[in-house]
């Protein structure tokens, strides 16, 4: 079992939660980043820094993650590519990406992108608070249990 993390955009709290689960459940965590990151010093965690470039980390994740593995990402177009490949994807707020919700998630993402470009809306998502941390931990537990049963 392996959990991949799009490390450049993932909140530290979510990364830490995945590592905590990995230590308990004995699986590998792979952080994929476009820039150097601080890697937790556990043998179950690997860091892969990809060459810089647009979507380099995304492309790496799509090429290397396989069905039965989980990718943590907040990038909706990346999640769409992963889900189309049969890979499970979860955002750091605890919402699972699925074939059933991808078109809606892409439409919302595109709407917010358009509104930001028109200056009608501010930057990124709200802060990653306790509610989001708990929702992520619950979803992570549920998905890991499901994937480990399927293995």
UniProtKB/Swiss-Prot annotation:
InterPro entries: UPF0178
Family according to the record: Belongs to the UPF0178 family.
Protein name: UPF0178 protein PFLU_5917
Organism in which the protein naturally occurs: Pseudomonas fluorescens (strain SBW25)
High-level lineage: Bacteria, Pseudomonadati, Pseudomonadota, Gammaproteobacteria, Pseudomonadales
């Amino acid at each position: 079992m392996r959990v991949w993390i799009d490390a450049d955009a993932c909140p530290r709290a979510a990364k830490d939660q995945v590592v905590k689960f990995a230590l308990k459940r004995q699986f590998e965590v792979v952080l994929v980043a476009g820039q150097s990151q601080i890697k937790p010093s556990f043998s179950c965690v690997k860091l892969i820094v990809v060459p810089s470039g647009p979507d380099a980390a995304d492309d790496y994740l799509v090429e290397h993650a396989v069905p039965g593995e989980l990718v943590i990402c907040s990038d909706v177009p990346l999640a769409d590519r992963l889900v189309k490949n049969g890979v499970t994807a979860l955002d750091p707020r605890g919402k699972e990406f699925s074939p059933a919700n991808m078109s809606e998630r892409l439409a919302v993402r595109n709407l917010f992108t358009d509104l930001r470009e028109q200056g009608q809306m501010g930057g990124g998502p709200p802060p990653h608070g306790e509610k989001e941390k708990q929702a992520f931990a619950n979803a992570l537990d549920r998905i890991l249990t499901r994937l480990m049963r399927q293995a």
